[in-house]
Every structure is written in structure tokens, then in C-alpha cells.
Amino acid sequence: MQTHEIRKRFLDHFVKAGHTEVPSASVILDDPNLLFVNAGMVQFVPYFLGARTPPYPTATSIQKCIRTPDIDEVGITTRHNTFFQMAGNFSFGDYFKREAIELAWTLLTGSVEQGGYGLDPERIWTTVYFDDDEAVRLWQEIAGLPAERIQRRGMEDNYWSMGIPGPCGPSSEIYYDRGEEFGVGGGPIANEDRYVELWNLVFMQSERGEGTSKTDFEILGPLPRKNIDTGMGVERVAFVLQGVHNVYETDLLRPVIDAVAARAPRPYDAGNHDDDVRYRIIADHSRTAAILIGDGVTPGNDGRGYVLRRLLRRVIRSARLLDIEGPIVGDLMATVRDAMGPSYPELVTDFDRIARIAVAEETAFNRTLAAGSKLFDEVASTTKATGAKSISGSDAFTLHDTYGFPIELTLEMASEAGLQVDEVGFRELMAEQRRRAKADAAARKHAHADLTAYRELVDAGPTEFTGFDELSSEARILGIFVDGKRVPVVTHGGDGADRVELVLDRTPLYAESGGQIADEGTISGTGAGESARAAVTDVQKIAKTLWVHRVNVESGEFVEGDTVIAAVDPQWRRGATQGHSGTHMVHAALRQVLGPNAVQAGSLNRPGYLRFDFNWQGPLTEEQRTQIEEVTNQAVQADFEVHTFTEQLEKAKAMGAIALFGESYPEQVRVVEIGGPFSLELCGGTHVHNSAQIGPVTILGESSVGSGVRRVEAYVGLDSFRHLAKERALMAGLASSLKVPSEEVPARVANLVERLRAAEKELERMRLASARAAAGNAAAGAERIGNVRVVAQRMSGGMTAADLRSLVGDIRGKLGSDPAVVALIAEGEGGSVPYAVAANPAAQDLGIRANDLVKQLAAPVDGRGGGKADLAQGSGKDPAGIDAALDAVRSEIAAIARVG
């Protein structure tokens, strides 16, 4: 039975049983703690947690899943895969154990004619949680399984929870006995190679509390609504039904192996273990890479992008080790498309983009391999010669830092060479590099101050931020610093009064973070110190908890312990909130137009302006850009309420709140919700109260800021109005100058540009015609030096090196077969001095070579040049030396001609 038929029968079975068919989610979700979707139930987590009401009581899906912790084991064994398909059925308070067991049993053992898989009931075993007597009874009643084929296991194997407080419950796993040839009997407990797990049924019936491990937590009581979550491994069912030994022999991966075998000089499964491992790595990783790129991941240096890069690099290197010559990744992507396209149409419709990204990574990595492999070979050879067994951490670091070798590649190559790698030393050097980078960044931020000076205040506790609720707060000065040194008092006009840092116990001034730049404002004295006033120019965080206000003392004095009033410039804050809320709106619009794969990669917002970086391959079309701007402004005009609240991290994620991947978050997070479902993000910044306060959003442009990362820039609010007014005035000026209505300006400009280009072409044609006429005259007036005909001339201005190279060839052809040399030089644009020399075969026979003569031209004009004996060229910088250069050529020819 082909895999696409296995999938179809699964979905048909559950749809007939009243389930709603739900498409697979993307393998990437907005969850900072989840690298990839790795289970079928992930997209349903909000329903299981009760954070959202499910739109259907039961559902079925076949989810794309990726697991990469065991990536190094892929290929070495046939059990590990980085991509797999999890077929599942789910009940949200509808049916429970009996129905779940009945549905699974009838599909597995039902006849092929009736839509089942036709598995032999006598070869099916199950495991249950050790005290789940109900499950044992149901298996006996429904399936007639004898007691010896129902094995009890503990929490480690047969009890499920998410690892946090929430739903939990026992599970029952279904296994298939492959027969005696695969090992000893005794059921799954004895041998999981012979007994293959096909399906896991999870009975969510209880609520768990906090715990210390997977198996150590408190059961708080029964759930008000019991749920079902099941997962059947499509690939495992496929290799059982197709009668093969493992997933690599199924119709999903065997075509990739066959495609590799067609290019490799050595076949698969011919008794060479290392080669077989390489075949399997290529097959597995190619499939996973295609799925990842299809879901919007692009190769990068961290997170999901790094996983993709590592997978592709392992494919490329495995192909090299199989002695496959030339590029192969494009062919592999096509094979994956053909094998999996029926199940995943995006692999077909988006194939050009998928192949382009994969091939670009192959090209780049081949350059890395070429550069670094030579050094690795030298390092490995030296290591062995000294009798050492391990490549030093320093050498591994050099390979990484200089040649871009990831440590995993160095480990892999070292293992093949019979060596180990000092990973500890490597990690220490990497950590030191990161420490230096952080120290440099901190030093730049804090004017190279000694940050240990703030340690006492950091240890005393965090600064209280009051700026969400008020723009002015009474506070106490906890510390005063000048140039990083703590001082008791600072006075206007005193030394360092413009370089002061004040630490307060509380403040309404926002410290730069989360892409939002710091507030501006004032800190003023009270009471006897009323005359003291300082302008706040920046606010930074130290150790994430201590707000440091950089100020310029404008009057009076500040003393540690004084009570002061810290106030935000309200106009600045208004602009900052417009920029930050505008960023959220643009992010939501991007995802609405481009899809969930447009993942945030960074942002900057300040009053009136926002900048948003996101993961995306290739530039946006004009239509996409216009649509993003329109969706954003429609949401702004909708006057959505902006609602902020704190929530448990897991609950917020279950609600669908977007988080930055790779960021660490506390257990309690702040959520910013704009317009209900329109935008929901984890965010600690300041925002408007409703979307209409943002004002218009004008996208200025979109550009690339790195491989797979695009940037959108926009004005918001009054700055957007000003920009539009400026553009309107510019258009009016153009219309006036061109004497056409504004709406006709683009067509008029296009017409003028076309006419200008035509005129430029005609001028170029006339210039070249004039130059060729001059060439004919030059040939006719050639001088003789000895028995050599020589044309050595200064040409008219504006000539390029290409012009001169063409002309010397033309003139040389007109001088006949006698020894002849042509040397032309001109004063080009921008003070450049291009020149070219040609020597015919007869002149070369006398020892006169163009590449020698070009050096004579070069010296007087401060230039350089090179070429071959028949043709050479160059360029200089000093037009004053042109005549001397031509004289030098004539002298050189005369000297050689006399010798000849």
C-alpha cells in the first residue's frame, strides 16, 4: 500500500466517524521554546488547555513533524528520521477511551476492501499505564486481545503530560510484531526492534500540578472535560504494510536513494556501512530540508535557519564522500517533490523557490569546504604526526571563525579521520569571543565605564517602572555616576555635568529594549533642591533590572538620596507609542499578506518611524508592499482597542501570542493585544490606547539586510503626513516643470527617459564612428622606428579602456604583416588615463611584446597594466604624463628594433 493511500484511508476513516479534517500546520509556530512542531497535537494545544474554544468537537489531521535532537544518529541507524508524518485523531470533550480504542482497532485490522489497513490482529500488542485497568478491559472487550499481549508500563513510558501544569493522563501504545527474524519474543517490553510502535493513544483525564521531572508531579484531580489525543506514525505503518525492513525502503525515501545511486560510483546496500550511512543521510535530510524551506525557513546561523543549514551541509558533504561529482541538491529537491508532492502540493507549486534556496546554500558551502578542508587536512595530519588523539580547541575555533566550519562538521570530519576534538577548549574560546563582544557592546553603551561600579545597586533590587500608568513619578536618587565612577553629588557647571548617570528607585522613563528606543524627559529637584534640573538624553538597562538615566545637568545640584520628579516628554512618548504600536500593526499585516512564515527578525521604533526585519527569501513585489500598507492602515482606521495584560507564559502562547524565537521569557509575561485576533504579541513596550492614535502608516521601502532577511521601513503619525506632503509637493513641482497634470507625470518621465537613452545611444554610435575614422587615419600615418611600423597616439577625451582595446586591434589589422605596434592612450572620465597596446606576430618575433610595452606607458602616468604578448591594457591616474608615456614606448621599440 502506497503512503498516499495510507494517508487517505486514515483521514477517510475518521471523517466518516464525524471528525473534521484539519490541514497540517506549518512546522514552525510562534513559540520561542519550540524549535519545530514535533507532534500532531501541537496546533490543538490551546483547545486542550482551555485557552480557546474548539470550533469542532472532534478533529483529524496528518501533521508534518520535525525532530532534530538525534540528527547525528540519522543514517547510522534506520530508526532515526528528522522528518515524519503524524496522523492523529482528537476529541475535545466528546468521546473518550472506548471510542478511541475502537476507532484505532477497526482501522488497523479492518479489511483493505472496507477501507482498513488489513493488519493481522494476532500480531498486534498493546501497552497500557500500570494501573489503567479500564484500558486493559476495553482492549480485551473490543479487540479480544489476550492478557499476555497487553503489557503494563510505568509513567516513563505510558503517562503523558506537557511537562507543565495542565492536562495529563495515561496512554496506550499499539505495537506490531514483525516476526522472529527481527529478534526474540516477549512483547514491546522485551524487544522494540521486533515490536514496532505504530500508534499512541493518550487519554487526557486529569490535571497535573508542579513537579520536578517527567515522572514526579502531583495529580490535582480529574479534568472537567476529558480529551483524546492520538498519534500514528505514517512512515512506520508504511514500512509494515509495504513489507520492507525500514522507512528508507518505503516509497517515500527509496526514490531519493535511487536518485543518489544513479550519480554515485558505488551502489547502496552493497556491504559498505559508511556508504549506506551517507545514502540515508542524503535521503532523510533532503526531505526535511525541502519541507523546511517550503514552510519558510531559510539557511542561517542560529535557530531554525541553522538546523536547515546543517541538514543541507550534511547532504552536500555526504554526496562528496560518495564521490559524486558536481551539484546534486537541485536534483534531490526535484526527487523529493515527485515523491511527496501528492501529499504536500506546496512542494510542487513553490518548487522553484525551494530549489533556488537549497542550491544557493550548496554553492556557498562548496566554497566553504574548498577553503577549510585544506586547513583541516593540515591540522589532522599535524595532530597525528605529534601522536595526539585530539584536534585542539584552538584549531577547531580557527576553522569555525575563519572558514565558517561549524563545530559539528569538524567533529564529523575528525571522527572519519580517527580523531577527537577538544570540544571543551572550543566552547571556552567561543564563550570568550562572546564575552568580548558583549563587553565591547556594553563598553560602547556605557562609555567604557567599569560596570562593577553598579553592582551594589543591581544587587539591591530592580528599578520600579511606572511608565505604563503615568508620565511623571516621584523618585529617590539611589546613585550618581560620572564617567562610570560613583559620586555623592553633581552640580551644574561642574566637571562631568554633561556625562552624568542617575539611578532612581522608580521611573516612568522607558529604557531602550525590545526595539523601542529610550524615552526623553527631565529629572527635577523638589523642596530645597527645587532649582535642580537635568535633561534625560538616554535610558539604558544594566543586568536587565537597573534603569540608568543619562542626563545633562542644566541647573542646580543633585545629591544621592534626594527626592526628585522624573518626567517623560509627553510629545516624545506619544510618538514612541505610535511607532511601537505601528510596528505591531505592520507585523500583523505582513503575516496576513505573506503568511505565518514571515517571522520577525528584529525591529526598531522611535517617534514617527519604525523599522521591521523579518525572515523572507527574495524581495516583496510592489503588489505585496501595497497590500501590506493597505491592511495596516485599514486596521489603524478600525480604531481597535489596545489591551495589555500579564499572563503565564504557557497560557499566553496557547492563546496564540507571538514571541521572538530564541528569546528567553519570564514565567509571567506582558501581552499586547490589538483588535482581538488582529495582533497578539508578547511585549514589554509602551503603546497607544487604540489603533486610530497611530495615525497613517506610510511604507518608505523594503530592502535586504542579510541572507533571507528583509527590512520594511515606515513613517507613522505626523511624520507620515509630512512625508506625504513632501511627496505631493515634489510631484507638483515635477508636473509644473514638465507642463503636464500630476497623474501624467510617470508617463511623461518614462517618455523622456526613453528619448534620453536613445540620444545617448546615438551619441555613442557617433563617437565610435569618429574613433574608427581616426583609427584609419592613424594607420595611414604610421611612423617607422627601425623596421617596425608604429602608431603611438593620444586619443580624444572620453575614451574608455574597452574603446582603446577595440581600436588598437582595428589599427593593428590595417598595418599589414610587417612588424607593427599600436599604443593608444587617452584622458578618460574622472581623471583616469586608460591605455592599450597591440603587437602583431611579426613584431613579437622581434621580441616586442605588448605586455612589456604597457609597463612603459604605465610608469609616467602612475598606472598599472598587464596582458599578453599580443594585447595588453591598463589605467593610470596622472594625465600630465601622457606625452612622456608615448615617448617611453617609442624609445623601448627603438631599443628592441636596433637589437633585432
From Swiss-Prot:
The keyword Protein biosynthesis applies. One of its GO terms (cellular component) is cytosol. The keyword Zinc applies. Its main location: cytoplasm. InterPro entries: aa-tRNA-synth_II/BPL/LPL, Ala-tRNA-lgiase_IIc, Ala-tRNA-ligase_IIc_anticod-bd, Ala-tRNA-synth_IIc_core, Ala-tRNA-synth_IIc_N, Ala-tRNA_ligase, Ala_tRNA_ligase_euk/bac, DHHA1_dom. Its cofactor is Zn(2+). It is an enzyme of class 6 (ligase). It catalyses: tRNA(Ala) + L-alanine + ATP = L-alanyl-tRNA(Ala) + AMP + diphosphate. Keywords: Aminoacyl-tRNA synthetase, ATP-binding, Cytoplasm, Ligase, Metal-binding, Nucleotide-binding, Protein biosynthesis, RNA-binding, tRNA-binding, Zinc. Its EC number is 6.1.1.7. One of its GO terms (molecular function) is aminoacyl-tRNA deacylase activity. One of its GO terms (biological process) is alanyl-tRNA aminoacylation. It is found in: Cytoplasm. Belongs to the class-II aminoacyl-tRNA synthetase family. This is Alanine--tRNA ligase.
